[in-house]
């Protein structure tokens, strides 16, 4: 689980054995029974968080997106299927000011302030992009209809 404090800090807690989904580093083989601040985000003001099955997303006050946890289906958006044990910026969204994020079990979605939506992760008809393979980096949805929020 993830929470954002009034100061914009992110805390996580819960089972910690799945590929760094809590964001505290590689050696998370025990449960985190109480909220613990994610040190890798120190100094970053966070506006929103989203938790998938074994991955997490963070949205900063400046519209940047970070991800961490299991990347087996590309749901982290880093161009690979590796685990990420601490938060890492989604480089494919650099320069895009994101206003909203959500995480599915094996997918991630973001909406930019201009209404353009992006999706990445397990394709298996979960993203609605008409693809047959997992999407390892954010892919822009067609812009015939702009989005407000995910």
PLM ranges: what are they?
Residues 1-150:
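Eukaryote-biased RCC1-like beta-propeller repeat architecture
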């Amino acid at each position: 689980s993830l929470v954002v404090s009034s100061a914009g800090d992110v805390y996580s807690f819960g089972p910690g054995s799945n590929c760094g989904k809590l964001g505290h580093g590689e050696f998370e083989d025990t449960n985190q029974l109480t909220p613990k601040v994610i040190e890798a985000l120190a100094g970053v003001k966070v506006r929103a968080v989203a938790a998938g099955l074994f991955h997490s997303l963070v949205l900063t006050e400046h519209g940047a997106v970070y991800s961490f946890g299991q990347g087996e289906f590309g749901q982290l958006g880093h161009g690979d299927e590796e685990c990420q044990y601490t938060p890492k910026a989604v480089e494919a969204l650099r320069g895009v000011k994101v206003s909203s994020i959500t995480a599915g079990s094996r997918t991630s979605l973001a909406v930019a302030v201009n209404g353009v939506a992006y999706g990445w992760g397990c394709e298996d008809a979960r993203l609605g992009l008409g693809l047959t393979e997992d999407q390892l980096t954010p892919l822009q949805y067609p812009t015939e209809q702009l989005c407000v929020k995910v």
